[in-house]
């Protein structure tokens, strides 16, 4: 959202003022992470993609009031009835961005692990594993892009 982008710009500006020696390490691109042209100049060069995308199924209203009442829908809902549309698009994009042997880590809904893991495999990921959170619920996956042969 425009508001999120503005706050990110402010945070980057403040970081640059406080830590000028590392200011050049940061660059902000405002783009749709699910679209193939986004950051295409970096395809095949990224070591790790760490993502907490919108993944809530459209019919699921979050129980936590701090989420339900304050987080924008854009940050919550995964774009389809089961909430996997946006996560699957990000998996496909990550498969292009990552170098051979690169790692993707993605948070997801407790109902989505196996589907997203299967999709990651079709995108060329190996060693795909769904992991449990501290409460024992399947909440994130790790996947390695096929190493170079």
Model-found features: residue ranges?
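S-adenosylmethionine
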Residues: 1-147
């Amino acid at each position: 959202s425009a508001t999120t982008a503005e706050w990110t710009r402010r945070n980057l500006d403040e970081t640059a003022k406080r830590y000028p020696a590392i200011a050049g390490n940061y660059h902000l691109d405002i783009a749709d992470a699910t679209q193939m042209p986004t950051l295409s100049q970096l395809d095949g060069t990224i070591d790790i993609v760490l993502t907490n995308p919108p993944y809530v199924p459209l019919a699921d209203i979050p129980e936590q009031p701090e989420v339900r009442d304050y987080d924008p829908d854009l940050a919550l809902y995964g774009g389809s009835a089961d909430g996997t549309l946006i996560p699957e698009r990000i998996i496909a994009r990550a498969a292009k961005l990552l170098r051979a042997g690169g790692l993707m880590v993605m948070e997801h809904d407790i109902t989505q692990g196996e589907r997203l893991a299967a999709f990651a495999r079709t995108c060329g990921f190996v060693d795909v594993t769904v992991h449990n959170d501290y409460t024992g619920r399947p909440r994130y996956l790790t996947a390695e892009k096929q190493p170079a042969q």
